[in-house]
From Swiss-Prot:
Annotated spans, Catalytic: 243-534
Lineage: Bacteria, Pseudomonadati, Pseudomonadota, Gammaproteobacteria, Alteromonadales
InterPro entries linked: aa-tRNA-synt_IIb, aa-tRNA-synth_II, aa-tRNA-synth_II/BPL/LPL, Anticodon-bd, Anticodon-bd_dom_sf, Beta-grasp_dom_sf, TGS, TGS-like
Protein name: Threonine--tRNA ligase
Organism the protein comes from: Shewanella woodyi (strain ATCC 51908 / MS32)
Molecular-function GO term, any one: ATP binding
Assigned protein family: Belongs to the class-II aminoacyl-tRNA synthetase family.
Gene Ontology biological process: threonyl-tRNA aminoacylation
Gene: thrS
Length: 642
């Protein structure tokens, strides 16, 4: 007679074994109707799974985040069901859940078109509307193998052969005539899978290995209700408008081409953005007392082997040979910084030593994963390493955290999620060392009044880590900043300092990044601002336009005054109507549009309007220059009078 304990502490006793669905029905018909699955003693289970011992149970519905994930997974099976009806010859591979949706990898000789995707979605809708029951059957490995062999599902057979023990009992989910294999759980009824949309199709190698066959990956999104689906689609529509690749082309910021995949060709305005961002970080480095250094672009393979990076990163490293020596272009800066630290004897009085670099790094990312500025092969890290004693860890981490928040606030990012990754099973050092390291990070976060989530076991083998994930205006998450303790690399590369007792000690190394990659962060900013950069960051901050040729000399005078005040300004003397000029520079997202006619010239004024169409009226040029200069120095996010 199992006794079921519910989240509110109430208990229900049953005479026979029960399922989550039975318990939900015992509570009430409404809950039974809404029940998707159950969390039994902390483990997700199908609604039909039997509970035969005293257990704690949480009933999962579509209102729960877990419930939405489950229905998304079931939508992947629904996709498979519909796909096999339309293309019976297709072979199904895998169909997992991803952020906001799902996908299915499929082997089909016919290349899917948009018309095919539309037909597939239509068939999915038809099937879902029948509200058919999903039947779970658990049997032997051989039964599962025979089932898929009879259906010619070679990928499912391979998964069974290579990934599932013959002693296991795989779960098969029957969607009418369609059968899929999964750990589950899944929805008990397709009535829960009504609000979805297929989004796109792309190529994907089986098991992510380019030596294997290229499959077709169909992506979809699914939500608990119509409203949530609509909100998500609207957000995607807005994201498409803000796509940094599209805006980058419109504003002539950069381009990429096939001869240099994953490498950025910065154009004048894009490089202006890059340099302004670098200038800002460089000022922060001075504020927080960092040295700025520059290490070589490539180093001998021997050094990468000593640092341990060769074992973990060699496949992602670009290499070259010269005079019988193999060199690797650096994928990160840390080994080079240790080499700089090692030059000359260091005392405990020299610590903490904070070393920063705008390091040009390269990683041989798979071509299919490259995505504009967000995923590149050549990138610049705002990388820094702090060499300190163990007693200094907390104060140094605290300073790093403050620097991260100072930086993000300048760009308007206030929604920041912080996670602390703790000791993994395989690690160096003893528990005392890890206790001290983790406690130092916790105390640094607490001292800065920062809430954080602990990720048990997710730290690196050489030390715990803090991750900073910022959320943009579309509520997308971008993991950018990290503060990572490292108790291994300094020792591997022979870094030491002379302690107060004259003994040789190994320093603790703190890896610190704020933006991560400047290229990626600029991609984030382009989308966050939709190309409307704050004045201090904008490539061109003001453009001065004449109405007739009579004002040409005055336009030159105004531009010179602005430039003398450190304002990036240009002139537009074209023989075009002023309305045409204003529209063109508005599309270029120039913050301030200055118009001069005879009256403005006579009074030494400019007529000012913003790129958003706000008319600021006529202003003395010296006054305007002073206001903009102040706005730039403060790195204000808003334009004048906004």
């Amino acid at each position: 007679m199992p006794v079921i304990t519910l989240p509110d502490g109430s208990k229900r006793e049953f005479a026979t074994p029960v399922s989550t669905l039975d318990v939900a029905a015992d509570i009430g018909p409404g809950l039974a109707k809404a029940c998707i699955a159950g969390r039994v003693n902390g483990e997700l289970k199908d609604a039909c799974d039997i509970i035969d011992t005293d257990s704690e149970l949480s009933i999962i519905t579509a209102k729960d985040e877990e419930g939405v994930e489950i229905l998304r997974h079931s939508c992947a099976h629904l996709l498979g069901h519909a796909f096999k009806q339309l293309w019976p010859e297709a072979k199904m591979a895998i169909g997992p859940v991803i952020d906001n949706g799902f996908y299915y990898d499929i082997d089909l000789d016919h290349k899917l078109t948009q018309e095919d995707i539309d037909a597939l979605e239509k068939r999915m809708v038809q099937l879902a509307k029948t509200n058919y029951i999903v039947e779970k059957r658990v049997g032997s490995w051989q039964v599962a193998r025979d089932t898929f062999e009879a259906r010619g599902e070679t990928y499912k057979m391979e998964i069974l052969d290579e990934n599932i023990s013959k002693d296991d009992q795989p779960a098969l989910y029957h969607h009418e005539e369609y059968v899929d294999m999964c750990r589950g759980p899944h929805v008990p009824n397709m009535k829960f899978c009504q609000h979805f949309k297929l989004m796109s199709v792309a190529g994907a190698y089986w098991r992510g290995n380019s030596d294997n066959k290229m499959l077709q990956r169909v992506y979809g999104t699914a939500w608990a209700d119509k409203k949530a689906l609509k909100v998500h689609l609207n957000r995607l529509e807005e994201a498409a408008k803000r796509d940094h690749r599209k805006i980058g082309k419109q504003l002539d910021l950069y381009h990429m081409q096939e001869e240099a995949p994953g490498m950025v060709f910065w154009h004048n305005d894009g490089w202006s953005l890059f340099l302004e961002l670098e200038k800002f970080i460089r000022q922060k480095l001075g504020q927080y007392t960092y040295q700025e250094v520059k290490g070589p672009l490539m180093m001998d393979r021997v050094l990468w082997e000593r640092s341990g990076h060769w074992d973990k990163y060699s496949e992602a490293m670009f290499t070259t040979n010269s005079e019988n020596r193999e060199y690797a272009i650096k994928p990160m800066n840390c080994p080079g910084h240790v080499q700089i630290f090692n030059q000359g004897l260091k005392s405990y009085r020299d610590l903490p030593l904070r070393m920063a670099e705008f390091g040009c790094c390269h990683r041989n990312e798979p071509s299919g994963s490259l995505h504009g500025l967000m995923r590149v092969r050549g990138f610049t890290q705002d990388d820094a390493h702090v060499f300190c004693t163990e007693d200094q860890v907390q104060q140094e981490v605290s300073a790093c955290i403050k620097m991260v928040y100072d930086t993000y606030e300048t760009f308007g990012f206030k929604d920041i999620v912080v996670k602390l990754s703790t000791r993994p099973e395989k690690r160096i050092g003893d528990d005392d060392m890890w206790d001290r390291a983790e406690e130092a990070l916790k105390q640094a976060l607490t001292a800065n009044d920062i809430a954080y989530e602990i990720l048990p076991g997710e730290g690196a083998f050489y030390g715990p880590k803090i991750e900073f994930t910022l959320h943009d205006c579309l509520d997308r998450a971008w993991q950018c900043g990290t503060v990572q303790l490292d108790y291994a690399l300094p020792g591997r590369l022979g870094a030491t300092y002379v302690a107060e007792d004259n003994s040789r000690q190994t320093p603790v190394m703190i890896h610190r990044a704020i933006l991560g990659s400047l290229e990626r962060f600029l991609g984030i900013l382009i989308e966050e601002y939709a190309g409307k950069f704050p004045t201090w960051l904008a490539p061109m901050q003001a453009v001065v336009m004449n109405i007739t040729d009579k004002q040409s000399d005055y336009v030159d005078e105004v531009v010179n005054i602005l430039k003398e005040n450190g304002i990036r300004a240009s002139k537009d003397l074209r023989n075009e109507k002023i309305g045409f000029k204003i529209r063109e520079h508005t599309l270029r997202r120039v913050p301030y549009l200055l118009v001069v006619g005879d009256q403005e010239m006579e009074n030494k004024e400019v007529a000012v309007r913003t790129r958003d169409g706000v008319d600021l009226g006529k202003i003395q040029i010296s006054e305007f220059a002073s206001k903009i200069k102040e706005q730039i120095s403060l790195r204000s996010l808003n334009l004048l009078e906004e």
